[in-house]
Amino acid sequence: MDSKSGRSESAINIPESNSTKHKSTAVHTATKVAAVAPRGGGWRRGVSIFDFILRICALAAALAATATMGTTDQTLPFFTQIIQFQASYDDLPVFTFFVVANGIASGYLVLSLPFSIATIVRPHAAAIKLLLIIFDTQFNDFCQRVSGAVVASFVAAVILIFLVVLSAVAIRKH
């Protein structure tokens, strides 16, 4: 297999026919070499299928979180039935942001599913790559700022996850 071109060659031996077997001429076996291009996109298709499954799982988790938080409320009597405390997600701005952010993430995931299916069907589609190249070459400042914002967002998410784990450990010890 030629590693530079990505093609493999296979030899096809063609035996002599019955009409030439009985002749006393020299026997020649013809060998034809055909270039066989391997079917590409195998690993890309696998990655695309894994991407699609992860998107569906993330969509299910985001929708479950949004629905659970959005429908959570409780009324607690305090001393008597006349004085009551009511807790709802919209009492705290953090929980409201949580519901809105998960709703937006769910919408994004729903809208991105057709593109994920397209990468499964056609793993060699170059439109997305070309669009990224166009944005990177034309909007250099924009791409750098977006990259920085995404990295900062991931750092914030990791810190928040760490804070949740730390809070869980602190609550467990009490």
From Swiss-Prot:
Ranges facing Cytoplasmic side: 1-46, 118-119, 172-174
Feature: compositional bias, Polar residues: 8-18
Pfam families found in the cross-reference section: CASP_dom
Ranges for region Disordered: 1-25
A GO CC term assigned to this protein in UniProt: plasma membrane
Membrane side Extracellular: residue ranges: 68-96, 140-150
Compartments (UniProt record): Cell membrane
Segments passing through the bilayer: 47-67, 97-117, 120-139, 151-171
Keyword Glycoprotein: no
Lineage top rank: taxon: Eukaryota
Family that this chain belongs to: Belongs to the Casparian strip membrane proteins (CASP) family.
NCBIfam families: A_tha_TIGR01569
Assembly information from the UniProt record: Homodimer and heterodimers.
Protein name per UniProt: CASP-like protein 1
Species: Triphysaria pusilla
